[in-house]
């Protein structure tokens, strides 16, 4: 006798939960997105400024999507805690200033007032560089572990600030690799191993890269070449860590190496804030939109005034090895 009222109540509750709601993402005001990195390697260091935008995201291969609008005509200054100051300049390639050699690539020779050669500068970036993409570069700054760096950006009358400490990084003692067999065809391939001493008594966070920093910032590939690491479960000596066991987004896999290939590994120091930033990005990349997934949102930032992105200072330790052919 009571079934009908109960069913009616359920239908009423369900109907009450259905309401058209227009999110209207296109009305969101664009925010500045900052990609900024300083390392202990020789510069110049790159900073990219773009505008955020909203819209549908339907391409699972997000590595090939880069339609962000660059922010130009910004004033960018980086300084440190010992009063070293550098004003960045737009990154533009002027082909007329450079010579070309098929082994050396593009380079230019710097002369003093007497015509003596004092330096040779090599262009290690893509020559098809569009200044509208929002890249800027330092002119003389050199990153040093243990220092704190300050970033100031002025664009369209607004100021954005940040600072980042550069932690020390342990040296990579050596690299190795182990052989794997593909299930589908039985081919042999290799995955890299890393060996290093892990400082004890302090919290350490790392970013492991399987591609040099300049390439990973300017080019996109379908392979996942990054891994973030906390020292929570690391022993005092990291004895052959299998990098390919790291967490990777959907539709991306760690690269497979073959005989004759070179393996590059970079170990970068991270602050806790930088680790949290990358971890948040990774969680977003792995989000499949399911009912039990976290709601999409912007990752944490160390930028002020509502800007997105992150300003990172990292020391880098690097190694490279070649996987020999069996007859070598």
Model-derived regions, located:
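Local alpha-helix boundary/kink/capping signal
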Residues: 11-12, 42
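Sec-dependent signal peptide recognition
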Residues: 2-9
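C-terminal motif of bacterial Sec signal peptides marking the signal peptidase cleavage site
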Residues: 14-16
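A sequence/structural signal for flexible, mid-protein segments enriched
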Residues: 18-328
